[in-house]
Amino acid sequence: MEEIKCIFCEIESSQVVIEENGYQGKKCPQCGLIYVSPRPSFDEIVSLYGHDQAHISSASHISDSFQKRLYARHNLGIIRSVVKSGALLEIGAGAGYFLDEARKIGFYPFGLELNPAQADFIRSELKIPCEESPLSTTVFEGKKFDLVYHCDVIGHFFEPISDFRKMNAVMQDGSFLIFETGNLGDVDQHYFKYFQRFQYPDHLFSFSTDSLSKLLDRTGFEVLKIYRYAILPQLILNQLTAGIRQRFFKSARQQGSSANGGRAGKTAGGIQQSRMGLTLKMVIGPVWDYLNYLLRYKVGALLPKKGRPQSIIVIAQKRKTVG
């Protein structure tokens, strides 16, 4: 464990705004960056993914195809307004559904994913090149990319400035960096109660618009546009229904397991009930995912945003090398 300062302002903040799982999130009074301090070592953080101990398991990522593809198609609609094809690198590719959707519309996809099960799924099931390694200038034999993308990954970077410089190094001049993240550093603290968890310690940094601008400027990028979506209604809905959803989906999983494995002597009526539970989950799950999608990207685009929780999509371009 080590104490750190704001990576931009080099200020050692004493303002603790988040406490979770024995860790503290401190907020820089100048740029709004929220950072975990003291924090675990790099090897300890990597082990969370290598041993599948992250809050969202690899099995959940892989099974959540409908939601992942829905969100991917939305973001690809924005991406195609600035770049329509080319070599695409996704950092933190999860189960690879964004890459698969991008391939359908003309991109050549490549992924980086630390979780072994998900990386293997991308390679073996989706047939997409994927390296099970952190970002470096030697990934995919030093290939240069036309687009680098990541979603809800920036908070995991151990050294964001170093990692964004690596992104810059693997990109063609004038190519695009596009990513989705939160704006927690801009959010009034009384809204923090609507977050069910902050996923400490695997989320090490939470950015404000100011700190994101500093990060991009220092690492050779120019911000072209930021899309903003208010997520407070989505947070409230998920908080209010958390207990119900947990009980329902747990019951459906158990019923599905019983229907597939089955105990000896299980009645026909019991099997039918189990199958009905599994079918109900298969119907309600996508409806729930679509409702969350509408709240985030359609309703959220219209609602007030200042000081409130948002999901933001940043469009940035690599500055061209002079000479």
Predicted regions located by residue number:
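Conserved N-terminal segment of class I S-adenosyl-L-methionine
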Residues: 1-151, 161-166, 228, 297, ...
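A C-terminal cap/extension of S-adenosyl-L-methionine-dependent methyltransferases
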Residues: 4, 228-323
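A SAM-dependent methyltransferase catalytic signature shared across enzymes that methylate proteins
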Residues: 7-14, 210-228, 290
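Short catalytic micro-motifs in class I SAM-dependent methyltransferases
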Residues: 151-158, 202
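Short N-terminal helix/helix-N-cap motif within the alpha/beta-hydrolase-1
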Residues: 158-162, 189
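Short glycine-dipeptide loop
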Residues: 171-177
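Short, glycine-/aromatic-enriched active-site segment of Class I SAM-dependent methyltransferases
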Residues: 179-206, 210-217, 229-231, 239-241
